Structure formats: C-alpha cells, structure tokens
Amino acid sequence: MEMHPEEGYTLLKEEGLKPTFYHDCSEEDIDLAKVHLGLQALKPMGVPVRTTNENFGSVRRVYIECLQDHALVPEFQKQMYTELPCEQVISMDTSHSPFMSAPGELANHLMSLS
C-alpha cells in the first residue's frame, strides 16, 4: 500500500494485489479487478463512526467470513464480528474477494438470507 498523506489518499501497489486480495482468483479476474481499483481517501479512515441502537442497532447483521483472507486475517475478522455481534456468521474458504473467486457460492449465501 502506498500512502500519500499530503494528497489525502492511499493507493494499492500492483505487486501486492494478488497475494493480499486475489490469491484464489484467475489472472483474468485480477486484470478485471485492477481496472476498477482507484485511490482510497484517507480522511474517512480517521473519522469515528457514530451510530445509534435505534437506527444501526435495528439492522440485521450477517458477517461473511473469508477464511483465506490475507487483507483482514480471520483472527481480525473474528474480533470484528465478536465486538459487533451478528445474527449469523457465514464462513467461506476464499480470499478477501469471494465476489471474484466464488461468486456463485457467495450469491447462494446472500439469497439464503432473504
């Protein structure tokens, strides 16, 4: 990841894309993903999120856990869904990008929730 604090953004380095986000994706899918990646603003990462039980607390929460994720390792994912409990945790044996590597399986999980 390339940080540019003066300009207010971060950029993913191309050499880190496959091992971090797409290690179980085809080269064709990785090329497609690259076309859609852009700069990420830094400012939102440092602004606290404020929610209320009345609004955010009333929304059903389900977590899709990616067991082969190298960007958000499973231990960190577990910490996230433990600190903000979810009704259900669905585990997938994929990288950070199940929408690229296992779209059918992901769609089936999402459809099962409706």
Question: Which residues does each predicted region cover?
Answer:
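Conserved serine/cysteine hydrolase catalytic core
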Residues: E28, V35-G104, N108
